[in-house]
């Protein structure tokens, strides 16, 4: 049982770390988008090179924003049975009857808990894998955005 708890904690820690990185980098992504919007008049009046760089920058910014949202809001598969350790399943099952929820949770036997924990590890690992995939794509798009923002800054000086 301790091994499962350790694995569960490790997977959840990776998910938390991914979310924290996404929030930090996402704020810079949004700041870059605001910079683009503030300077749109200057960009439109500039030459063709600046406009092309701006278009590439906007595309990279939008792509990064989409990947950022996919990192923060992963889709969950709902084909698993109701879990006694997943907060949403617990809340949905006992929202109207908290006392029954407390009683039912106290009655969970070790084998049932072990199975629910293993199921949650699998589900969270799938979420972590998706987040990892989208973080890689976000970083690529964000890198293109940073490069093009730098080129825009130089061309507008």
Language model: regions and residue ranges:
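Short, charged/polar, low-complexity loop and linker segments
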Residues: 1-8, 44, 103-110
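Short amphipathic alpha-helical coupling elements at transmembrane boundaries
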Residues: 2, 6-20, 85, 119-133
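Context-gated lysine
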Residues: 5, 21, 42, 81-84, ...
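A structural signal for alpha-helical segments
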Residues: 6, 47-50, 112, 116
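Short secondary-structure boundary micro-motifs
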Residues: 7-8, 54-55, 88-89, 110
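Alpha-helical transmembrane segments and their immediate juxtamembrane boundary regions
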Residues: 9, 13-80, 136-157
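Solvent-exposed, non-transmembrane helices and loops of integral membrane proteins
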Residues: 80-124
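A hydrophobic membrane-anchoring alpha-helix module
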Residues: 109-157
């Amino acid at each position: 049982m301790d091994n499962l708890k350790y694995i569960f904690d490790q997977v959840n820690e990776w998910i938390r770390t991914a979310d924290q990185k996404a929030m930090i980098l996402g704020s810079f992504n949004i700041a870059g988008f605001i910079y683009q919007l503030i300077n749109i008049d200057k960009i439109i009046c500039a030459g063709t090179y600046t406009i092309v760089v701006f278009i590439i920058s906007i595309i990279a910014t939008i792509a990064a924003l989409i990947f950022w949202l996919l990192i923060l809001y992963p889709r969950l598969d709902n084909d698993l049975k109701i879990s006694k350790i997943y907060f949403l399943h617990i809340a949905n099952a006992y929202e109207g009857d908290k006392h029954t929820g407390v009683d039912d949770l106290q009655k969970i036997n070790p084998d049932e808990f072990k199975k629910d924990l293993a199921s949650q590890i699998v589900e969270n690992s799938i979420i972590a894998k998706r987040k990892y995939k989208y973080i890689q794509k976000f970083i690529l798009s964000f890198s293109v955005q940073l490069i093009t923002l730098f080129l825009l800054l130089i061309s507008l000086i």
